[in-house]
Structure formats: structure tokens, C-alpha cells
């Protein structure tokens, strides 16, 4: 875990049949991203009103970390293909950066 406890969080819903997006993340996208240096996790609601909601969390060192993301995530043909595929399966995407309140130096 990085010292600052910062995470980029995206929440979204699936546009595809139940289980398809989950399998894509587990079998293809998460292993690829991790091989490229990302510390990334995906959570999905188990019980909720309405469609299942996904939470994609990616640990970041600082705000400048975003500068290297395009090359890490899409710098290879396989990465571009995976990103194009996942974007087509997602809807209602929202993103933010959060920080662990228990780390030193938290705040705005």
C-alpha cells in the first residue's frame, strides 16, 4: 500500500448480461492491469435495489500518477483492445479520488 492512501474510484453499471463483465474483469482485464503495475480491485454489490453496481479502485501515489496511466493501460495493442471492450460494457460511470482518513496528511 502506498503511503498517502489515495485511490481513484470509478462506479458504474454493466450494459451486458449478468456475469459477463465480472468474468471479463477477473479473467482478462485485472490480470493485464496488474501485469502493467496497477494495484487495482473491483467490487460488485451483492444485494441492492436496482442493477448491480461495480466499484473499480486503483491505488495512486499522487495526482501526478495519472500522467502515466494512458501508457500503462493502453500503451500496447492488447491494452487498447481491452480498454475498448470494457468501455462498451459500462454505463453510468462516475469517478473520483478518495483518501484514507487514517493516513497522515489527509485533507483537501
Give the positions of each predicted feature.
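Short hydrophobic/aromatic beta-strand micro-patches
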Residues: 13, 57-59
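Glycine-rich beta-strand-turn "strand-cap" elements at beta-sheet edges
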Residues: 1-7, 38-55, 79-108
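An amphipathic, aromatic/His-enriched active-site/gating alpha helix that lines ligand/cofactor pockets
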Residues: 23-41, 59-96
Amino acid at each position: 500500500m502506498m503511503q498517502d492512501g489515495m485511490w481513484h474510484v470509478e462506479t458504474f453499471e454493466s450494459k451486458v448480461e449478468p456475469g459477463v463483465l465480472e468474468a471479463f474483469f477477473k479473467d482478462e482485464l485485472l490480470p493485464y492491469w496488474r501485469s502493467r503495475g496497477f494495484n487495482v480491485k473491483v467490487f460488485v454489490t451483492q444485494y441492492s435495489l436496482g442493477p448491480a453496481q461495480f466499484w473499480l479502485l486503483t491505488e495512486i501515489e499522487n495526482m501526478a500518477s495519472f500522467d502515466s496511466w494512458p501508457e500503462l493501460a493502453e500503451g500496447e495493442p492488447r491494452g487498447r483492445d481491452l480498454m475498448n471492450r470494457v468501455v462498451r460494457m459500462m454505463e453510468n460511470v462516475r469517478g473520483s479520488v478518495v483518501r484514507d482518513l487514517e493516513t497522515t496528511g489527509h485533507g483537501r
